[in-house]
């Protein structure tokens, strides 16, 4: 009789242990996507409510317009996430622009305290449409598939003569600008000047 009770008790304890372990495993798997999501993007955090204010007509680098490199030094709506959080591949870039234009995607490294930067890699040319209605209460977030490797700590950058992918409502060194545009693989260069407009560009990992 005692042996029978012992067996039943052991079975109940075994079932409870299995249930506890199963719940623990489920909790781990549920938490994993959340932690992965936190590191899946960098640069600006864009949504349809972000206005590309004072971005049109498109702002040139110099007069007359020559191509320059713009490094995104401050991520709009995502402060502290300007740099790539991990090694990987960018599968998509998103942007908000006031009007149509184009640029070459670049990956850069920067030394903010020394006002220096360099480009390590060029990506594809991207042609964007901008906003169909300048008086709209919401704004189009455009998305483009890419395949661009990036290493932890690197920045998003673009090469263009002019751009309207901007939100100009503040000041400070939100962008490092280099004229002429930087070529990949070169040494660190001292910036030409800074820009107080935010570059509205976001990267999404593969």
Please describe what each predicted stretch is.
Residues 12-25:
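Sec-dependent N-terminal signal peptides
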Residues 1-14:
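N-terminal secretory signal peptides that target proteins for export/translocation
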């Amino acid at each position: 009789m005692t042996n029978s009770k012992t067996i039943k008790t052991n079975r109940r304890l075994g079932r409870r242990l299995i249930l506890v372990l199963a719940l623990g495993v489920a909790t781990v798997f549920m938490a994993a996507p959340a932690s992965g999501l936190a590191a899946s993007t960098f640069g600006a955090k864009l949504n349809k409510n972000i206005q590309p204010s004072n971005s049109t007509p498109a702002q040139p680098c110099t007069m007359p317009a020559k191509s320059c490199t713009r490094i995104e030094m401050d991520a709009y709506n995502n402060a502290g996430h300007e740099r790539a959080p991990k090694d990987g591949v960018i599968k998509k870039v998103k942007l908000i622009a006031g009007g149509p234009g184009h640029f070459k995607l670049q990956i850069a490294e920067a030394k903010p305290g020394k006002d220096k930067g360099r480009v390590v890699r060029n990506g594809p040319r991207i042609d964007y449409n901008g906003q169909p209605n300048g008086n709209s209460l919401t704004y189009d977030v455009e998305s483009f598939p890419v395949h661009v490797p990036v290493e932890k700590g690197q920045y998003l950058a673009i090469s263009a003569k002019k751009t309207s992918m901007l939100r100009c409502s503040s000041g400070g060194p939100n962008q490092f600008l280099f004229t002429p545009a930087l070529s990949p693989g070169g040494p660190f260069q001292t910036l030409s000047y800074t820009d107080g407009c935010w570059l509205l560009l976001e990267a999404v990992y593969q």
